[in-house]
Amino acid sequence: MADLSNERVVYINGEIVPESRAMVSFRDRSFKYGDGAFDMTRTFGHRIFKLDEHLKRFYKSLKYLQMDPGMSLEKMKEISEEVLARNLHLLNEGEDYWVAQRVSRGVEPVGGDIHEAAEPTVVVECTPLPFKARAHYFRDGMEIVIPSTRRT
């Protein structure tokens, strides 16, 4: 069995698993139709920044989309903090994470009604902030393109 002490873990659908074992079905509505919502915040000094505010906004978005995450805001907060805690040992001093919560309506039944209720897909994960890889953007700036076609 592989040594997983150097692999980040992720919460997915009720379990905390190594990232290498975290799978989302290709039939998940978020993959097929973009039918999902997410929120992301970062850590400062290994603490999640304004998590309560982010989760309130996230749950407001879920309500607007009529998407039930299958858990309370308090439970999502608890999971977010646990996932972070289980991944902190992988950071060096001065490094931090993005912490993301993602919810979709889940996997729709093949040949079924697209409005049929499914179990939501819920993911909470941490990704290291790429400070070193992006330092040159802060130092040198970056080119951008502004399309002439305006969207409303």
Region roles according to the model:
Residues 1-152:
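Conserved alpha/beta cores of soluble small-molecule-handling proteins
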